[in-house]
Amino acid sequence: MSEAPKKRWYVVQAFSGFEGRVATSLREHIKLHNMEDLFGEVMVPTEEVVEIRGGQRRKSERKFFPGYVLVQMVMNDASWHLVRSVPRVMGFIGGTSDRPAPISDKEVDAIMNRLQQVGDKPRPKTLFEPGEMVRVNDGPFADFNGVVEEVDYEKSRLKVSVSIFGRATPVELDFSQVEKA
């Protein structure tokens, strides 16, 4: 008895903004055509982010790879045609148009690790880096500009060097109190 071919991960390009619908449609097509044995997971890797809008903290999801859907599958003519027949699928990424290349196990591991890390705590929608200019929009230092010195994503706080009366003064601020300058 021969061993079943191994399912590999492929990257499918979808219309931007329709990744979720493409993933759902693909799952439905797989069931409809009884091809569950050729397919594994179909996913759109996302992370939960927090943004401040109008003084309110809002959670939303941000896609790691906008415009792409990851599909675990055995590549053959039937599975290739099934994926290509799904509405809003533009094609596969990597390899040639008729012989797509799977992504490496190393890349898959990196994506899976990133997904596991994300599950713990939502990240801010805006990421800050040391040396970056920011504008304080709340608190006693509102309307002052400053330079980010340290970023603490665990506590969602920044240490910003604000210029007060010509002197740089380090100030601890919450992510919600600053915006990129």
From Swiss-Prot:
Assembly and partners are described as: Monomer. Interacts with the transcription termination factor Rho and with RNAP. One NusG monomer forms a stable complex with a Rho hexamer. Binds directly, but weakly, to the core enzyme of RNAP. Also interacts with RpsJ (NusE). The rRNA transcription and antitermination complex (rrnTAC) consists of RNAP, NusA, NusB, NusE (rpsJ), NusG, SubB, ribosomal protein S4, DNA and precursor rRNA; S4 is more flexible than other subunits.
Please report the organism this UniProt entry assigns to the protein.
Escherichia coli (strain K12)
Residue ranges of every copy of the KOW domain listed in the record: 130-161
Give the InterPro entries listed for this entry: KOW, NGN, NGN-like_dom, NGN_dom_sf, NusG-like, Rib_uL2_dom2, Transcrpt_antiterm_NusG, Transcrpt_antiterm_NusG_bac_CS
* Biological process terms in GO annotation: DNA-templated transcription termination; regulation of DNA-templated transcription elongation; ribosome biogenesis; transcription antitermination; transcription elongation-coupled chromatin remodeling
**GO cellular component assignments:** cytosol; transcription elongation factor complex
- What is its biological role? Part of the processive rRNA transcription and antitermination complex (rrnTAC). The complex forms an RNA-chaperone ring around the RNA exit tunnel of RNA polymerase (RNAP). It supports rapid transcription and antitermination of rRNA operons, cotranscriptional rRNA folding, and annealing of distal rRNA regions to allow correct ribosome biogenesis. Participates in transcription elongation, termination and antitermination. In the absence of Rho, increases the rate of transcription elongation by the RNAP, probably by partially suppressing pausing.
One Pfam match, given by its short name, reads: NusG
Family of the protein in this entry: Belongs to the NusG family.
Name of the protein described by the UniProt record? Transcription termination/antitermination protein NusG
Q: Sorted alphabetically, which keywords does the UniProt record give?
A: Ribosome biogenesis, Transcription, Transcription antitermination, Transcription regulation, Transcription termination
Q: Which HAMAP family match?
A: NusG
- Please quote what the entry notes about the protein's domains: The N-terminal domain interacts with RNAP and the C-terminal domain binds either to Rho or to RpsJ (NusE). These domains are separated by a flexible linker.
